[in-house]
């Protein structure tokens, strides 16, 4: 029997590939080669699955990244910021999922609340890191917002900004803000 996480991972793959309308019980059971009984063993209908899917997205693509950066509590803000940038840049294929969740959030209230929570958590963490930088020519909160909007914009333009160009944008922004080469 597939685990709850197997169902959620399959849901994220479908969401990234084809958008929220593709995430149906029929598609999921077909993708996993399982019965609807297995699905209902883990979730109380479509609403329960979609709630769990949004929570899974948040856990994997926000909470997990922050927790990974915070594994070294003695690291200074600069080291943590660089580590976060490296983690974000390591998953360029994640952009399709980010785009799909944002598109879903435009049409669904629950997805919108989840996206707002994700954006708020991410920007609050970036603000915390930017406030801890030794020196910045840009106000810390503004720098945090700028770094986040670079990522969102890079994912949304067509074609999306390639990972190496996104890395260069981050490196230039951090160099302009701190006077140091961090990436």
PLM region spans:
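Helix-turn-helix
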Residues: 6, 10-52
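Short, Lys/Arg-enriched anionic-surface-contact patches
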Residues: 1-3
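Short helix-capping/turn signature of helix-turn-helix
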Residues: 43, 90, 101-107
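Solvent-exposed, amphipathic alpha-helical segments
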Residues: 6, 10-18, 64-68, 101, ...
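Hydrophobic/aromatic-rich alpha-helical bundle segments in the mid-to-C-terminal region
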Residues: 112-116, 131-183
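Amphipathic alpha-helical packing segments from all-alpha helical-bundle domains
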Residues: 62, 83, 93-100, 109-135, ...
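Short, basic, alpha-helical segments at the C-terminal edge of helix-turn-helix-like DNA-binding modules
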Residues: 55-62
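Hydrophobic alpha-helical connector segments
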Residues: 66-95, 147
